[in-house]
Structures are given as structure tokens and as C-alpha cells.
């Protein structure tokens, strides 16, 4: 029996491992790990739920760069190797777990040997008649129950900024009802509250491409949206921090008017902006509700949020102008 130490290079991470050889490898045991962030004596294992979403993809990437072992939960594993529609990176995880959070039987072993659970699960454009209650609350509750049973050390969850202002809306209430479940679970936890993703701001870009941007209200409400890569760093850093809540925004604060004008400028188009009064937007919500409650709830949230500021502590380096520039060369953003 011959013992040798091998170094394997994976992306920016070196894994220092001890292999026992008898002409071929018969066991492979990790003994320590070196990354650009220093030495980690024991590689922590992290579950990422929502891995195929905008933020989740960046979280997987950041976790790997910081030297964590990653299990990615995916409903559709075929999405993992593709570049996301908002320029998110493909997913390179240590393990892929195929399951659906709304089907507890499919995720029973999800947290086996997991130290940290992260979830950015939320209802987006799914077309299977699920509700915000089904996904944002119950789906995350299903993960939490398994995390508690598996003695996970910490649970990190992405909710909504200024949620207390919008809990009368089902999309926010579902998130915050889960937050209360997490707070009462007995687990260590961190709630991440971003102001808004750059992917959300792509809607302004899409409208500008079509020639017109529609703004709710007077366009003076302020927001400092954040890039997925910058927010992912906040999420991953929360693993080793004691904060129970972290609010995060990007480095630059804009008004709605300024975001619209920026989109037109990047596209080298003449700004054409139509302002929609709040009363008219609310009328649209009521008109849509009998036919599609999910869509009306989402519009209702954006109408309410668009009437107030969403400015959180600034972090990150990525600007909305740079992000819009990436979208120019024929990239689909829907």
C-alpha cells in the first residue's frame, strides 16, 4: 500500500487529498482545502435550493469560489449547463439533487450530510397552477422541515426588502409567513433582503427595446438594485456571520426615470416614456384578477413597491449600465 498526496485543480479551488493506492485508487479522503480565501480545515457542505434561478446560479458559483461543497436542487437538471436568460452562469455543482419542493416525497433525502441550507425558492413564471402559498411558503417549509430533521447548522433565506410595507399582498405574505417559521425553527438563520435584482430591471430594457417605457407614478421613486454576483457574495458571507437579517442593495441609487433613460441610452434610442397614474394601474390589477390571480398579485406588488423608495446599504461593484450593455448583442431577456 502506497500513500501519496495529490493536488487537484478545480476552477479557483485546490483540493488537497490523500489517496491510498494499490495500483489504482481505492479510497479518496479529503484532508484539507486551500482557496483564495484561505485554509478551510473541513469543507462545509451547502444545499442551494433555487439553483436554476437568477440568484441561485450566482450563489453556486460564489460558493465554489469560496471553497464549499455544493448540492444543487433542480426541478429540471437540463437547465444547469445553460447560460441563463439574464446572463447568469451555468451551474457547476458537486452534486445535483432532482426534486420538487412542492412534492415532499421527492426531496426526503435533500439535506442528508448538509451543513448549510440556502433557499431563494420563489414562484416566478411556472405554468403549473401553483400559488405563492404553494411555493414561497409551503415549498420552503418543506425544505425547512427536512433541514431540521437533518440537524442542518444554519438556514439562509432570501425574502423581500421592506416586507412590512407589503404584507397585505399574498406574494409578500407567503415569504414572511415562512420567515416566521424559520425564526421559530430553532435553527441558526439569516434572512437576506435585497432591494431588487438586475434581472428585474431587464423589464425596463425590454420596454426600451420595443420603443416605449411605461413608468408607474411620477418616476421619482428610488431604488439601488443589485447584481446577482454581488448579492451572492452577501449570501455566502452570511454563512460565517451572526446577523439574523441583512438588507442589501447595489452601489448606485436610481429613480425609475433614470433607469428608463439609462436603458434608452445604452440602446442609443430616443427616450419615450409614458407615466401611468397609480389609480389606473390599480384598475388594471382589478381587471386582471378574475382571469389570473397570480399575475394580478404580481402587478399589485410592483404597483405598491413602485410608489415608495427601496434603498438599502450599498454593496458590490457591478453597475446597471454595465449589465444593460451585456444585454445589447441580441441577448434574449425574457
Give the location of each predicted region.
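Amphipathic terminal alpha-helices
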Residues: 305-334
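Glycine-rich Rossmann NAD(P)(H)-binding loop
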Residues: 216-221, 246-254, 264-268, 276, ...
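Substrate-positioning beta->alpha
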Residues: 139, 217-239, 244
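N-terminal Rossmann NAD(P)H-binding glycine-rich loop of SDR-like oxidoreductase domains
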Residues: 46-68
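Glycine/proline-rich active-site loop of Rossmann-fold NAD(P)-dependent oxidoreductases
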Residues: 199-206, 237-246, 269-271
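Glycine-/Pro-rich loop/turn segments that contact NAD(P) or position catalytic residues
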Residues: 123-209
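Terminal hydrophobic/aromatic helix or amphipathic segment near a protein terminus
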Residues: 258-307
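NAD(P)H-binding glycine-rich loop region in Rossmannoid oxidoreductase-like domains
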Residues: 78-82, 87-142, 146-149, 164
Amino acid at each position: 500500500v502506497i500513500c501519496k498526496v495529490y493536488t487537484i485543480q478545480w476552477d479557483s479551488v485546490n483540493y488537497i487529498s490523500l489517496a491510498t493506492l494499490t495500483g489504482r485508487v481505492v479510497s479518496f479522503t479529503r484532508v484539507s482545502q486551500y482557496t483564495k480565501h484561505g485554509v478551510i480545515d473541513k469543507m462545509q457542505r451547502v444545499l442551494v435550493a433555487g439553483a436554476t434561478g437568477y440568484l441561485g446560479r450566482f450563489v453556486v458559483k460564489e460558493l465554489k469560489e469560496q471553497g464549499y461543497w455544493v448540492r444543487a436542487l433542480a426541478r429540471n437538471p437540463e437547465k444547469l449547463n445553460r447560460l441563463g436568460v439574464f446572463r447568469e452562469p451555468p451551474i457547476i455543482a458537486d452534486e445535483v439533487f432532482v426534486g420538487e419542493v412542492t412534492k415532499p416525497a421527492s426531496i426526503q433525502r435533500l439535506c442528508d450530510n448538509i451543513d448549510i441550507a440556502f433557499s431563494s425558492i420563489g414562484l416566478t413564471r411556472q405554468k403549473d397552477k401553483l400559488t405563492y402559498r404553494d411555493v414561497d411558503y409551503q415549498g420552503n417549509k418543506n425544505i425547512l422541515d427536512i433541514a431540521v430533521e437533518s440537524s442542518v447548522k444554519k438556514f439562509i433565506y432570501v425574502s423581500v426588502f421592506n416586507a412590512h410595507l407589503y404584507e397585505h399582498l399574498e406574494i409578500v405574505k407567503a415569504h414572511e409567513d415562512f420567515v416566521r417559521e424559520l425564526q421559530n425553527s430553532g435553527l441558526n438563520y439569516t434572512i437576506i433582503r435585497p432591494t431588487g435584482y438586475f434581472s428585474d430591471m431587464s423589464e425596463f430594457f425590454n420596454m426600451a427595446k420595443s420603443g416605449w417605457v411605461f413608468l408607474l407614478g411620477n418616476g421619482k421613486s428610488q431604488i439601488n438594485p443589485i447584481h446577482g454576483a454581488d448579492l451572492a457574495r452577501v449570501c455566502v458571507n452570511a454563512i460565517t456571520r451572526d446577523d439574523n437579517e441583512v438588507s442589501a442593495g447595489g452601489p448606485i441609487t436610481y429613480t425609475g426615470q433614470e433607469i428608463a433613460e439609462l436603458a434608452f441610452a445604452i440602446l442609443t434610442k430616443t427616450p419615450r416614456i409614458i407615466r401611468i397614474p397609480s389609480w389606473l394601474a390599480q384598475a388594471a390589477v382589478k381587471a386582471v384578477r378574475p382571469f389570473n390571480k397570480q399575475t394580478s398579485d404580481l402587478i399589485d406588488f410592483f404597483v405598491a413597491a413602485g410608489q415608495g423608495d427601496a434603498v438599502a446599504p450599498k454593496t458590490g461593484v457591478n453597475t446597471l449600465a454595465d449589465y444593460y450593455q451585456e444585454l445589447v448583442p441580441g441577448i434574449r431577456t425574457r
